[in-house]
């Protein structure tokens, strides 16, 4: 608002993570038309990491990355994912038990559950190309239910993506409200196409 700008475009607004490389920066290859990109996580708005050594490590990395003349897309996104994993281990159980999360989950489950399962399997098998996965490579309701069962080992990784999307949803809502209060509109882009190896 101070620079007289009225529209701020964010690309990619949707998650495009397939390879964890710079090629994921292409905004028109989203893996979900609903999931927000983890690159938008604002750590200043999150709880502090309790482990002092880890907190110091991430602060040093933040300063190093912010001092670069150009954004290092891969390192920034990988650092943000690692930071979110630390916070999930620290805060995740309480967050997922909260009434705010439950309300978010009830509204978003139709896309959040398959997205989170896809992300967990992508990491497990090291590729977004689900046709090459040894299992879960075809839609199967029984397999989906097993991945969503909190008593299974797979659920912990699936729930991490629930946590990340909840955090991003809340932060984006706050950023949107702040921008609107200053007369600025946040603009994404309509994902008319999705990555052929995406969750959707």
Where on the chain are the PLM-derived regions?
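Acidic/aromatic-lined carbohydrate-recognition and catalytic surfaces
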Residues: 1-200
């Amino acid at each position: 608002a101070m620079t007289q700008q009225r529209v701020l475009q964010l690309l990619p607004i949707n998650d495009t993570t397939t390879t964890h490389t710079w090629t994921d920066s292409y905004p028109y290859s989203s893996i979900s038309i609903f999931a927000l990109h983890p690159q938008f996580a604002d750590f200043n708005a999150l709880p502090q990491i309790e482990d002092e050594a880890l907190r110091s490590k991430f602060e040093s990395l933040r300063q190093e990355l912010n001092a670069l003349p150009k954004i290092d897309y891969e390192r920034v996104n990988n650092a943000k994912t690692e930071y979110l994993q630390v916070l999930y281990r620290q805060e995740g159980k309480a967050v997922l038990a909260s009434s705010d999360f439950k309300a978010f989950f009830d509204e978003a489950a139709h896309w959040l559950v398959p997205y989170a399962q896809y992300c967990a399997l992508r990491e497990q098998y090291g590729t977004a190309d689900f046709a090459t996965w040894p299992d879960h490579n075809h839609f199967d309701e029984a397999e989906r239910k097993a991945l969503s069962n909190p008593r299974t080992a797979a659920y912990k990784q699936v729930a991490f993506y629930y946590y990340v999307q909840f955090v991003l949803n809340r932060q984006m809502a706050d950023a949107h409200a702040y921008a609107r209060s200053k007369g600025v509109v946040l603009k994404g882009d309509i994902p008319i196409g999705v990555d052929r190896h995406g969750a959707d």
